């Protein structure tokens, strides 16, 4: 039964996901981590590309979320549709515009274009926070330093006197003061450095070490290192790089002379220099004497001194953090990290914590980062923070791979560093196939999102906006250690598809194993089908059945379709190959294993990756799309459906082009998307009843079968969600690397358009959440929802303690004062929802067919419902031992 919905009932909200933010100028400044510990060291404040999150170090939970989209000022700064988006470069504790500020709940945020915002990270976000703009000409803010009430800012700029092809940056150092009378920041020039290759700041923020190149000479090896004090003249020295290179090093390869990282201690006495060869040089700045630390096999990517200079942290491609005791030359290791270490810092006034940034370079389509906060005393993990980890079909924009001694798909060598950036930019603009789709599955039981991530799977809670688990599902080198140098060419097994049975009790994965390169068998791939299960009290999935080459040697699986509940209680699935073959797998309780039950041999004389499957709810019919043919099969006989006598039933359709996806709606209509059209076929009539032209958006853009990731169906109402991505052009009509997308909601036969929404980024996937909503993911790893109901806790910043201030008491009482406070809080919630409704209705009055519709963040529909104190009477039943989150959920159920 199809539910009749009006266009105003669907709303769009961007509510979850996001990437942890790094300093965009980190390739120059060397300090990538922007996250800060609070003054009491109980909270860890970390910026994302769409929000700022505050984590409790003790409970490991996110206790506050400041979403940019929920504040007009923040959304105006960070969510503009521009090629160079605003990004956070520094967070300082307190309000720096007020001297001697003692409020521990405030932070001052600096952006790369000079915006300064003062935010409250505890309690409710102020509607109009303080906002200032530092006047910068053609400069970008790179860092901000603070010492005893004095402030310095470091900016980067392109020196116009240098050649156009010169990619080096120049620095300016300014003194920063706030004029309270004029209510503005003023800057005073302090120093300037040109052609900076690399730099780093001491952990106390008082010393700057940088390496510059002399471009006036033809000698590309002529480089110098300088160490300067930012707030006084106590330290100011410079020396050529060659003076700290041994004669043996100078005669070896360029990797032994290429500096990949640096660190300066707080006293200005020691300088650590890491090379692409893996060697670390400790330089005594008093006499330029050096000693070598050798353990790393590939490039040293990060270095940091402890506060007293007695320890050195180092990290690289080995996925191991090394802690060097400099007096004794002894080492401690923290191995088996999830990624290579691209940044390490010492945090806290006493250096109680180490912060690490890991990059999972196995995914070369995206920059996947994970932030770790470690206890310095025992190296135990206190926090592990990351967003969704999608693997896109093609490499997206702004991807930066670390430097390695070798040039591979997952790394950049010294010679290819700048060339790879230009090549990738040209490819993004000129390539015809702009396929940035990804594969995501939703668990039918707990609604968690499953992201296949090369050899592993990430389990992400959409509603809590947190990673639940990260589990390796294949056997590969990368599972237990990092790869260095030539090992980077070894390809790990890749999980290409993942499905769940309808009851959510079984997970089905399909992976491909690759043999080593440069062998006669290099093209002989191994295809593996695995069936997994887990108990409710377990975290990891357990392998039950493994099938090697299920469709034959070197025959890939092109489609997996779980069975409906009517077939073996949903514990079954279909697999299809690229030659028209079908196999039915089912769990056999007698064998206590998954077994092959039925097989349909290939019945086509050619190969195609355009394969689609659909299954009727009663399990009797299978719809098999292969190339441009759509066949109806009888499940009992596993052969082409044959009609009864005296009846005429169409059992095969021929479409205009290759079929990309097939969706069966209410066992009546079949939605078929090809390269050129979107069709609705009425099975009772045996004819196409509605059709839309998709040729300008789909033809040649997506890989065969990937259009299925951009079309989904609400199995309860029959409504269809379709995503259309469009590449933007500049004023001259030249294509750019930016995109916008449109989500269109249709009814079950495509006759009525129920919703039309525009999003400012490329949408890579959309899926139905087994309830009333559609969830989507864009290439910035942000998650959104299009649905008839949107949870207020998702669209608003997390602030449970602030919303429930009127409810917190040692004992729950019914006094008049508590009732008044409770009613006031509920009134604020209701009034905020009504304001959102008014804004949403005005937005949706626009013409749904307008091609350049502006993006609106719509925070969901609230039902007009009478709320009084009697509405909450039942909520106080069994109130003992109820957590605040559960109590808040009860409030929201009453309101919605």
Swiss-Prot record:
Gene3D superfamilies: YVTN repeat-like/Quinoprotein amine dehydrogenase. GO terms for biological process: maturation of SSU-rRNA; maturation of SSU-rRNA from tricistronic rRNA transcript (SSU-rRNA, 5.8S rRNA, LSU-rRNA); positive regulation of rRNA processing; positive regulation of transcription by RNA polymerase I. The keyword Ribonucleoprotein applies. GO terms for cellular component: 90S preribosome; nucleolus; nucleoplasm; peroxisome; rDNA heterochromatin; small-subunit processome; t-UTP complex. InterPro entries: WD40/YVTN_repeat-like_dom_sf (IPR015943), WD40_repeat_dom_sf (IPR036322), WD40_rpt (IPR001680), WDR75 (IPR053826). It comes from the Eukaryota. Pfam families: WD40. It is found in: Nucleus, Nucleolus. The keyword Secreted does not apply. One of its GO terms (molecular function) is U3 snoRNA binding. WD repeats lie at residues 295-334, 490-542, 552-595, 605-645. Keywords: Nucleus, Repeat, Ribonucleoprotein, Ribosome biogenesis, rRNA processing, Transcription, WD repeat. PROSITE patterns: WD_REPEATS_2, WD_REPEATS_REGION. Present with 6560 molecules/cell in log phase SD medium. Interacts with snoRNA U3. Interacts with MPP10. Component of the ribosomal small subunit (SSU) processome composed of at least 40 protein subunits and snoRNA U3. In the absence of snoRNA3, forms a complex with other t-UTPs. This complex can associate with pre-18S ribosomal RNAs. Involved in nucleolar processing of pre-18S ribosomal RNA. Required for optimal pre-ribosomal RNA transcription by RNA polymerase I together with a subset of U3 proteins required for transcription (t-UTPs). This is NET1-associated nuclear protein 1. It comes from Saccharomyces cerevisiae (strain ATCC 204508 / S288c) (Baker's yeast).
């Amino acid at each position: 039964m199809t539910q009749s919905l009006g266009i105003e009932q669907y709303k769009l909200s961007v509510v979850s996901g996001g990437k942890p933010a790094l300093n965009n100028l980190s390739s120059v400044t060397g300090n990538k981590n922007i996250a800060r510990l609070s003054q009491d060291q109980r909270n860890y404040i970390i910026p994302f590309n769409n929000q700022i999150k505050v984590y409790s170090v003790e409970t490991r939970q996110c206790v506050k979320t400041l979403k940019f989209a929920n504040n007009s000022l923040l959304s105006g700064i960070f969510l503009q549709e521009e090629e160079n988006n605003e990004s956070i470069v520094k967070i300082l504790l307190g309000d720096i515009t007020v001297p001697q500020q003692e409020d521990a709940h405030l932070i001052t945020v600096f952006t790369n274009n000079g915006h300064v915002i003062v935010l409250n990270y505890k309690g409710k976000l102020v509607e109009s926070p303080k906002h200032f703009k530092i006047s910068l000409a053609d400069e970008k803010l790179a860092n901000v330093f603070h010492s005893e009430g004095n402030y310095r800012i470091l900016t980067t700029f392109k020196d116009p006197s240098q050649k156009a092809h010169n990619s080096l940056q120049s620095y300016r150092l300014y003194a920063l003061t706030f004029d309270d009378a004029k209510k503005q920041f003023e800057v005073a020039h302090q120093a300037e450095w040109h052609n900076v290759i690399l730099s780093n700041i001491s952990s106390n923020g008082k010393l700057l070490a940088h390496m510059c190149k002399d471009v006036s000479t033809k000698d590309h090896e002529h480089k110098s290192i300088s160490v300067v004090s930012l707030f006084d003249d106590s330290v100011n020295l410079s020396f050529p790089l060659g003076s700290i290179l041994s004669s043996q090093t100078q005669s070896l390869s360029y990797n032994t002379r290429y500096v990949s990282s640096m660190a300066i201690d707080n006293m200005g006495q020691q300088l650590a220099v890491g090379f692409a060869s893996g060697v670390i040089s400790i330089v005594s700045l008093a006499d330029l004497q050096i000693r070598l630390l050798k353990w790393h096999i590939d490039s040293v990517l990060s270095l940091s001194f402890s506060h007293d200079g007695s320890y050195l942290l180092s990290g690289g491609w080995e996925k191991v953090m090394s802690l060097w005791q400099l007096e004794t030359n002894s080492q401690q290791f923290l191995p088996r990290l999830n990624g290579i270490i691209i940044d390490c810092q010492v945090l806290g006034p006493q250096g109680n914590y180490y912060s690490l940034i890991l990059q999972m370079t196995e995914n070369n389509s995206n920059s996947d980062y994970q932030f770790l906060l470690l206890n310095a005393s025992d190296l135990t993990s206190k926090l592990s923070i990351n967003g969704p980890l999608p693997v896109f079909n093609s490499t997206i924009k702004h991807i930066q791979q670390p430097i390695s001694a070798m040039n591979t798909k997952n790394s950049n060598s010294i010679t290819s560093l700048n060339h790879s950036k230009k090549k990738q930019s040209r490819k993004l603009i000129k390539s015809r196939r702009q396929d940035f789709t990804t594969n995501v599955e939703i668990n039918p039981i707990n609604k968690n999102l499953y992201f296949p991530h090369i050899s592993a799977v990430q389990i992400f809670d959409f509603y809590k906006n947190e990673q639940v688990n990260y589990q390796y599902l294949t056997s590969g080198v990368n599972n237990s250690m990092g790869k260095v140098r030539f090992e980077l060419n070894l390809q790990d097994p890749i999980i290409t598809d993942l499905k769940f049975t309808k009851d959510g009790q079984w997970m089905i994965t399909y992976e491909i194993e690759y043999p080593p390169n440069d062998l006669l068998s290099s093209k002989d791939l191994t295809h593996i089908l695995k069936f997994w299960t887990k108990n409710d009290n377990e975290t990891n999935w357990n392998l039950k059945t493994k099938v090697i080459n299920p469709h034959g040697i070197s025959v890939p699986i092109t489609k997996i379709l779980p069975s409906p509940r009517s077939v073996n209680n949903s514990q079954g699935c279909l697999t299809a190959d690229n030659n028209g073959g079908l196999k039915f797998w089912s769990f056999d309780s007698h064998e206590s294993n998954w077994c092959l039950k039925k097989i349909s041999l290939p019945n086509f004389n050619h190969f195609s990756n355009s394969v689609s499957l659909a299954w009727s709810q009663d399990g009797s019919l299978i719809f098999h799309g292969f190339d441009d043919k759509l066949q109806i099969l009888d499940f009992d006989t596993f052969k082409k459906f044959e009609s009864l006598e005296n009846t005429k039933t169409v059992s095969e359709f021929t479409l205009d082009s290759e079929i990309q996806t097939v969706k069966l709606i209410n066992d009546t209509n079949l939605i078929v998307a090809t390269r050129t059209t979107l069709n609705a076929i009425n099975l009772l009539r045996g004819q196409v009843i509605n059709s839309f032209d998709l040729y300008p958006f789909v033809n040649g853009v997506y890989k065969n079968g990937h259009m299925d990731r951009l079309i989904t169906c609400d199995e309860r109402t029959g409504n269809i969600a379709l995503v259309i991505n469009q590449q933007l052009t500049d004023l001259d009509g030249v294509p750019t690397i930016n995109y916008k997308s449109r989500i269109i909601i249709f009814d079950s036969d495509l006759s009525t358009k129920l919703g039309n929404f525009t999003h400012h980024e490329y949408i890579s996937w959309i899926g139905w959440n087994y309830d009333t909503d559609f969830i989507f993911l864009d290439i910035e790893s942000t998650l959104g929802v299009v649905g008839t109901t949107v949870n207020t806790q998702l669209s608003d910043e997390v602030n449970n303690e602030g919303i429930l201030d009127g409810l917190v008491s040692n004992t729950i009482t019914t006094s008049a004062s508590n009732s008044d406070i409770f009613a006031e809080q509920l009134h604020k919630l209701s009034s905020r929802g009504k304001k959102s409704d008014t804004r949403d209705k005005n937005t949706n009055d626009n013409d749904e067919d307008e091609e350049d519709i502006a993006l609106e963040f719509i925070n969901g529909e609230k039902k007009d419902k009478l709320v009084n104190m009697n509405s909450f009477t039942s909520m106080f039943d069994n109130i003992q031992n109820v957590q605040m989150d559960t109590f808040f959920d009860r409030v929201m159920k009453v309101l919605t």
